[in-house]
Amino acid sequence: MLTTMKKSSLVLALFAIAATALVTITYALTKDQIAYQQQQQLLSVLNQVVPKEQHDNELYKACVLVKNKDALGSKQAMPIYLASLNGQHSGAAIEAIAPDGYSGNIKIIVGVDSDAMVTGVRVLSHQETPGLGDKIDIRITRWVDGFLGKTVENAEDKNWAVQKDGGQFDQFTGATITPRAVVKAVKRAVWFYKTHQEELQTLPLNCETK
């Protein structure tokens, strides 16, 4: 009986070793492809929120990490991609979190030019209700295009609210919480950029260590 148990243990051990080796080999073979796909997805989003004619640098490489929960909605450092054109700063793409979505965090990226005018907004991830709150997704509706060309005049700019709250942005029928959360998050991101633009340009490019 002991011999049988030893054999079973040996078989299990060999199986575990083989499984671990398979996972390791699979990861080694696919990690470069996964990294490439992630980079291409990032490039696509960056070019959607910061137009190509606005920059001539490699945005994904010109990245700084900024930790500011009040402005960017997260305790974790968030990436900000700095655009430049002909060697001059020309805007940024700012990742931020709207922590008060109906179903939890909504991750967004906000593009701005050097005058802090919005050049694009995209929702990177969310868990909002299909058919209601998911209208923030560009694949569902063009609602986020309502931010284009707008800026924040001051920290108390009352235009930056949904119409139900006296602001300029549409809400959704039966789903006010979601657009309200996104509007507030975009406002905070734009105001942060507007008031920290020069400081951002002095930070070290450090997103590769994220």
Curated annotation (Swiss-Prot):
Subcellular location: Cell inner membrane
Biological-process GO terms, alphabetical: electron transport chain
Cofactor(s) this protein cannot do without: FMN
InterPro entries: FMN-bd, Ion_transpt_RnfG/RsxG
Enzyme Commission number(s) from the entry: 7.-.-.-
GO molecular function: electron transfer activity; FMN binding
Pfam families: FMN_bind
Keywords for the protein's UniProt record, in alphabetical order: Cell inner membrane, Cell membrane, Electron transport, Flavoprotein, FMN, Membrane, Phosphoprotein, Translocase, Transmembrane, Transmembrane helix, Transport
Residues found modified as FMN phosphoryl threonine: 176
Enzyme class: translocase
Assigned protein family: Belongs to the RnfG family.
Summary of subunit composition and partner proteins: The complex is composed of six subunits: RnfA, RnfB, RnfC, RnfD, RnfE and RnfG.
Matching HAMAP family: RsxG_RnfG
Name this polypeptide is given: Ion-translocating oxidoreductase complex subunit G
Organism from which the protein derives: Aliivibrio fischeri (strain ATCC 700601 / ES114)
Lineage: Bacteria, Pseudomonadati, Pseudomonadota, Gammaproteobacteria, Vibrionales
